[in-house]
Amino acid sequence: FQQGIFVAEEIAGLAPRVIDEKAIPRVTYCEPEVASVGYTEEQAKEKWGADNVESYEYNLGGNGKSQILGTAGFVKLVRTKNGGPIVGVHMVGARVGEQIGEAQLIFSWEATPEDVAPLIHAHPTQNEALGEAHLALAGKPLHAHA
């Protein structure tokens, strides 16, 4: 709906803030769900160079709620190297569309894994997977499985 607000404000002459299309969350409602925001790893490498991008894929096998639900999937984080921010979050799994709001904030606020890692995520929830992925990319893996 932000695009509609943009158009209405533009027509009204209010000089609205330009919408960052990369910051619009994308969700495919299927089983399992697919959700993402920001750049894919390939897009990030094209924009910042392959040597300046790193990623981490957290397997939902390490997430207690996913084990309870009997579901599988992953959370993939893409960041720029040398302390750079998260530039993409990609998730596959049951109910991941419900997590994309936090991922959108992380991307839009240019948060680093080190910014997100100390934040507490409720247990047991699938949302913990987003926190665990940031812990791992920040060099502090907890329930990460290779």
Predicted feature residues:
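Acidic, glycine-rich loop-and-beta core segments that form the ion-binding/anion-interacting portion
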Residues: 1
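Flexible, glycine-rich terminal cap/loop adjacent to redox cofactors
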Residues: 13-17, 24, 29-146
